[in-house]
């Protein structure tokens, strides 16, 4: 097992549902974890599919919560958005954009292929300084509360297995293959360098 804990990042589009659910579970299990979004704005469901609530990444979860409470308490209570924001504000103050973070991670988990592509593109556009590898793995998770919870447990199990490998670089492909067979999901995986 590695002597130092894995530095993990979980990334979805708006740093609201999927990445925050995984952040919550991983931090409770003792992982060094941060979560991010890759979008240009934070989008939350609105009164209609074509009317999302759009916020800047600088907006706190508390401000979003109060804004939606004011707009339509019943709707946002019923669809679970207020509950989700309440959880989020207990984890960290506001959503963060992956592209603005210069921290180094051992493992970056993304929640959909488009986000995976954006993370890989961002990492590859940075100037390589240390040549330290970072494994980027995509676990497709539908953006709803139930799937976010199931996906978070899968991500957590995956991180625990990777944490317990003797040699992550040589064992990760085999480990991912086992996870694909067990979960019935396919994972994208690549290595980038810092």
UniProtKB/Swiss-Prot annotation:
Pfam families, sorted: Ssu72
Catalyzed chemical reaction(s): O-phospho-L-seryl-[protein] + H2O = L-seryl-[protein] + phosphate; O-phospho-L-threonyl-[protein] + H2O = L-threonyl-[protein] + phosphate
Keyword Calcium: no
InterPro entries referenced in this protein's UniProt entry, alphabetically: RNA_pol_II_suA
Coiled coil: 160-186
UniProt-listed GO biological process terms: mRNA processing; termination of RNA polymerase II transcription
Molecular function (Gene Ontology), one example: RNA polymerase II CTD heptapeptide repeat phosphatase activity
Subcellular location: Nucleus; Cytoplasm
UniProt keyword list: Coiled coil, Cytoplasm, Hydrolase, mRNA processing, Nucleus, Protein phosphatase
EC id: 3.1.3.16
Main subcellular location of this protein, as a coarse class: nucleus
Enzyme class: hydrolase
Any one GO CC term of the record: cytoplasm
Similarity section: Belongs to the SSU72 phosphatase family.
UniProt function note: May be involved in the C-terminal domain of RNA polymerase II dephosphorylation, RNA processing and termination.
PANTHER family, sorted: RNA POLYMERASE II SUBUNIT A C-TERMINAL DOMAIN PHOSPHATASE
Protein name: RNA polymerase II subunit A C-terminal domain phosphatase SSU72
Upper classification of the organism: Eukaryota, Metazoa, Chordata, Craniata, Vertebrata
């Amino acid at each position: 097992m590695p002597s130092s804990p894995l530095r993990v990042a979980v990334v979805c589009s708006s740093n609201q549902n999927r990445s925050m659910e995984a952040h919550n579970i991983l931090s409770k299990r003792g992982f060094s974890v941060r979560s991010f979004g890759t979008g240009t704005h934070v989008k939350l469901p609105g009164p209609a599919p074509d009317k999302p609530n759009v916020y800047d990444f600088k907006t706190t979860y508390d401000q979003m919560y109060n804004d939606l409470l004011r707009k339509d308490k019943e709707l946002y209570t019923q669809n679970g958005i207020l509950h989700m924001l309440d959880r989020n504000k207990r984890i960290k103050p506001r959503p963060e954009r992956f592209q603005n973070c210069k921290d180094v991670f051992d493992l970056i988990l993304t929640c959909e292929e488009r986000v995976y592509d954006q993370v890989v593109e961002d990492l590859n556009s940075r100037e390589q300084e240390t040549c330290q590898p970072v494994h980027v793995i995509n676990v497709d998770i539908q953006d709803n509360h139930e799937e976010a919870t199931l996906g978070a447990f899968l991500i957590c199990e995956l991180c625990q297995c990777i944490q317990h490998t003797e040699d992550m670089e040589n064992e990760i492909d085999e480990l991912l293959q086992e996870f694909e067979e067990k979960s019935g999901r396919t994972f994208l995986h690549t290595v980038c360098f810092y």
